[in-house]
Regions:
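N-terminal capping segments
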Residues: 1-116, 161-163, 174
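Low-complexity, Pro/Thr/Ser/Gly/Ala-rich linker/spacer regions in secreted
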Residues: 171-182, 221-223
Length: 223
């Protein structure tokens, strides 16, 4: 079963005005996956994907963190001194869906200046553009990614632009585990196909196609 973590709504079912902190246990929470997205963003490095998911789970398990759009950056401000680790925040504070995903990206290693402008975290409308500009992500918009969980990996960022965002924190789908060099050698031996078929198979398996191809080129030049 695929599960996602997200900042959802305040204790009154509203977007602002509630008490700081999670009053219901559901303001920031983990729930089952649902298909209602138009963009999936995936960190190219597996270790960064894992950190994104780790941050989201930590936030969901910290009752000091609640939902309030009008105070959406207070979690960021409190966590900055802890390396953006939400589990270390003890002061009741607030976030919203995109501010929390922004924090998860910072925790994974994205520079704050890339996602936070004028003290305000990225929104569901700006998150894709700002993450793409870092060069650290791949972006998927086809329905086999946005309307199904069959190709999703832990750490994938789900966005319905202008509305909501969440992160995959659990899935039974295969996760890329082999070193890039090992996969590149398999490519050289013809195990991953050619052309667009190769690109698709590598991407679907969770590998960074460009990184694999660069390693393939290095191997071939060395022969």
């Amino acid at each position: 079963m695929t599960k996602i973590a997200h900042a959802s709504i305040d204790e009154h079912g509203k977007i602002a005005g509630g008490k700081a902190g999670d009053q219901t246990g559901k303001e920031v929470c983990i729930r089952s996956y649902y298909a209602n997205w138009n963009v999936v963003i995936r960190m190219k490095l597996p270790e960064m994907r894992q950190k994104v998911a780790e941050c989201m789970v930590k936030a969901a398990n910290n009752a000091a963190i609640g939902y309030d759009q009008s105070q959406r950056n207070t979690l960021l401000n409190y966590s900055r001194n802890f390396g953006y680790d939400p589990s270390k925040v003890t002061m009741p504070c607030e976030t919203d869906c995109s501010a929390l995903v922004t924090l998860a990206c910072l925790y994974a290693g994205i520079q704050e200046k890339s996602l936070v402008v004028g003290g305000n975290s990225a929104t569901t409308s700006t998150l894709r553009k700002r993450l793409q500009a870092t060069g650290a992500v791949d972006v998927f918009t086809s329905k086999d990614y946005t309307m199904s969980d069959s190709k999703l990996l832990v750490g994938d960022i789900l966005i319905r632009e202008g509305h909501h965002t969440a992160v995959v924190v659990e899935t039974s789908n295969k996760v890329a585990t082999k070193p890039i060099e090992a996969v590149a050698k398999e490519v050289c031996n013809g195990l991953w196909g050619t052309g667009e078929n190769r690109r698709k198979r590598l991407t679907d398996a969770g590998y960074d196609y460009k990184a694999v191809q660069a390693k393939v080129n290095e191997i071939l030049k060395g022969k």
